[in-house]
Regions:
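Short, solvent-exposed turn/loop segments enriched in Gly/Ser/Thr/Pro and often Arg
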Residues: 1, 42-48, 104-109
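Short secondary-structure boundary segments
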Residues: 1-10, 47-59, 185-186
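Aromatic-lined carbohydrate-binding/catalytic grooves of carbohydrate-active enzymes
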Residues: 1-19, 110, 114, 187-188
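Short amphipathic alpha-helical segments, especially helix-boundary/capping motifs
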Residues: 2-5, 63-67, 139, 163-166
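A generic structural signal for ordered alpha-helices
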Residues: 5, 9, 70, 143-144
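A short, structure-level motif marking secondary-structure boundaries and short turns
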Residues: 11-13, 73-75, 117, 146-148
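Active-site-adjacent "subsite" loops/lids of carbohydrate-active enzymes
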Residues: 14-29, 33, 38-95
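Active-site neighborhood of glycoside hydrolase catalytic domains
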Residues: 80-193
Length: 193
């Protein structure tokens, strides 16, 4: 599992498996002992912070959007990438007893073809719908959420049809306004009604 789904990609976490400690399990267990829910936070398009090239991006250039980041960012318009991401997240959520999953769409954008994000919005909706379905098939209740831009205009610009997600109960929660200190709180309240 660790080869397929590396959970210890940051240097600080690499020391724990060598000492026989499963840090993810430990953190989740300690949260639950204290009555705190534990959520997995998954960046949809992580950037590589080492000098090593991302082999997956090198081997699947059709999964990548050429952008400001040297190796590009993940392209959710690719069905194959969607399946890879769904399998990746589902494996994590199956292995660990997280209470929920939050897909971070703000680290890093874009995740759809530049200038055509709204045109490709169904790709992200399809991804989130499948994720919700996968989570509902686990043997426990798992909340599904998304970290989103500061307002409706920014969501639409990035290709997130959050009104549809809310209407169809695709997400259980949103983390809003991550690119500003002045998010449109009223819009997020209306969205939740």
């Amino acid at each position: 599992f660790e080869q397929e789904c590396p959970c210890y990609n940051a240097g600080i976490y690499k020391k724990f498996p060598d000492k026989g400690i499963n840090i993810m399990e430990r953190i989740i267990d300690e949260c639950h002992k204290r009555g705190i829910k534990a959520y997995c936070h998954h960046r949809i398009s992580e950037v590589e912070l080492t000098s090593d090239r991302n082999e997956l991006k090198q081997n699947h250039k059709d999964w990548v959007i050429k952008t400001w980041w040297q190796e590009g960012l993940w392209n959710l318009a690719s069905k194959e990438l969607q399946e890879f991401k769904l399998n990746y997240v589902t494996k994590i959520m199956t292995k660990y007893s997280f209470d929920g999953i939050c897909i971070d769409f703000l680290r890093h954008l874009p995740c759809l073809p530049v200038g055509k994000q709204w045109e490709y919005r169904e790709c992200v909706t399809e991804f989130m719908t499948k994720l919700k379905s996968n989570m509902s098939n686990l043997n426990r209740q798992v909340a599904v959420g998304a970290k989103l831009p500061e307002n409706i205009e920014a969501c639409h610009k990035d290709g997130f049809d959050v009104e549809k997600w809310a209407k169809n109960n695709i997400v259980d929660f949103v983390v809003g306004g991550s690119r500003t200190v002045n998010p449109d709180i009223d819009w997020y309240i209306i969205l939740s009604l």
